[in-house]
């Protein structure tokens, strides 16, 4: 399902989906391919890319380039999430919550690939609604982007981390 490769520069790349699509024109159908990939450094940086070309390798290459350009930083807490989070994109909704050490990545399909390359080692998650890989990846990255560390919350409120954590 998701192929992983190590790149120089220590970026992990995963291929989530390759689809054959067609455009119908007067002379028949024009076939092309789309590829969905995620890239991460395994330490809180993750991005996804969607590429389209007449050949599969070209589509994958375009998707990888877009993924490297669109990376976000995620505030992780010792290999898990900071707090329970929800994300949504079109018909896909995802819910993720932190898990104790040894739980592993409990996630399905496209969500698992995103979490693995982001560096999350322990998480409980569930995808609701549409399980279209593109929308699930976008919803997962939306959720991770909205996650706040205690330091970020403390800075925003003008308090210390100890006051925030109680």
Swiss-Prot record:
InterPro entries: Ribosomal_Su5_D2-typ_SF, Ribosomal_uS5, Ribosomal_uS5_bac-type, Ribosomal_uS5_C, Ribosomal_uS5_N, Ribosomal_uS5_N_CS, Ribsml_uS5_D2-typ_fold_subgr
Any one annotated GO CC term: small ribosomal subunit
MF terms in GO: rRNA binding; structural constituent of ribosome
GO BP term (any one): translation
Pfam families on file: Ribosomal_S5, Ribosomal_S5_C
The keyword Nuclease appears for this protein: no
Ranges of residues in domain S5 DRBM: 11-74
Keywords attached to this entry: Ribonucleoprotein, Ribosomal protein, RNA-binding, rRNA-binding
Database matches in PROSITE patterns: RIBOSOMAL_S5 (PS00585), S5_DSRBD (PS50881)
Function: With S4 and S12 plays an important role in translational accuracy. Located at the back of the 30S subunit body where it stabilizes the conformation of the head with respect to the body.
Subunit structure: Part of the 30S ribosomal subunit. Contacts proteins S4 and S8.
Similarity field: Belongs to the universal ribosomal protein uS5 family.
PANTHER family referenced in this protein's UniProt entry, alphabetically: MITOCHONDRIAL RIBOSOMAL PROTEIN S5
Domain comment, as recorded: The N-terminal domain interacts with the head of the 30S subunit; the C-terminal domain interacts with the body and contacts protein S4. The interaction surface between S4 and S5 is involved in control of translational fidelity.
Protein name: Small ribosomal subunit protein uS5
Organism: Pasteurella multocida (strain Pm70)
Organism lineage string: Bacteria, Pseudomonadati, Pseudomonadota, Gammaproteobacteria, Pasteurellales
